[in-house]
Amino acid sequence: MIKKFFIFFVSVNLFAESIVVDGNLDEPEWQTAFKITEFYESDPYTLRKTDDETEAYIFSNEDGIYVGFINYQDESTMLSNRTMRDEMSSLSEKNSINIDFDGDRTKAYIIAVALGDSLFD
């Protein structure tokens, strides 16, 4: 059975009035957000298209940068292994974003969340 999972991922500023960090992407701002639907496997580094549909939304305003994910995946295939905080294991399903504010590819902010409620930043 395919289930639809919503993960609200990150907000640089959690005190914005327009976006509520509640796991739902139902605010009107998400309708105008930049949408990404093409994803590739990076661990292992095969760069093949992923089998499961994922939608990522990026929205920014003067209050911050907001990223939301909607993951569609058969529940029986989910890996929700618990990992230690800040452990970037390939043994679990996760969504992550990298932000290189300088655009020079020498440093970036990496933020991730996994099915087992593990966090990485």
Q: Where are these predicted regions, by residue range?
A:
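Sec-dependent N-terminal signal peptides
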Residues: 2-14
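Structural preference for beta-rich elements and adjacent junctions enriched in aromatics
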Residues: 15-121
